[in-house]
């Protein structure tokens, strides 16, 4: 979901573990030379999803990295397969009320219409939960979510050793 804390939490956890962090949207902007809004305006949703999928393939080849994908990554089934083949998928489940109450997100166009964000959550929740290897509930404060994510990452690291 947009605004659920993927990038913020991902950066903190990657830093804590001494790993690299990639925000997939930033990667898309870097590779395309256009911001996300420009890509949507020029290519539409379908065109953006193709670019996003191509960038995900690039990112999936990287090692020892924590990735924050865009919230719509799960709308393309092949993307779920790519993510699961290249690593573990963690869904950060943040209640819509918490997303909407975060004043630092007020500039995001998608979050201006409360009805749309609830609809988006309801449309995607089953995809998020079914594609996730782990679910981190981001209900309380950021520190609690970071602690949960570090526990998840340590489990993953133990499995890989």
Model feature map: region roles:
Residues 4:
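ATP-binding Walker
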Residues 86-127:
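A glycine- and Lys/Arg-enriched "phosphate-lid" helix/loop adjacent to the NTP-binding pocket
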Residues 1:
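P-loop (Walker A) phosphate-binding loop of NTP-binding proteins
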Residues 12, 16, 88, 126-161:
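NTP-dependent small-molecule kinase module
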Residues 71-73, 95-97, 141:
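Short glycine-rich anion-binding loops that position phosphate/pyrophosphate groups of nucleotides
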Residues 7:
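Walker A/P-loop
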Residues 32, 40, 52, 60, ...:
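Short, flexible helix/strand-to-coil boundary loops that buttress conserved ligand/catalytic motifs
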Residues 23-82:
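ATP-dependent small-molecule kinase phosphotransfer cores
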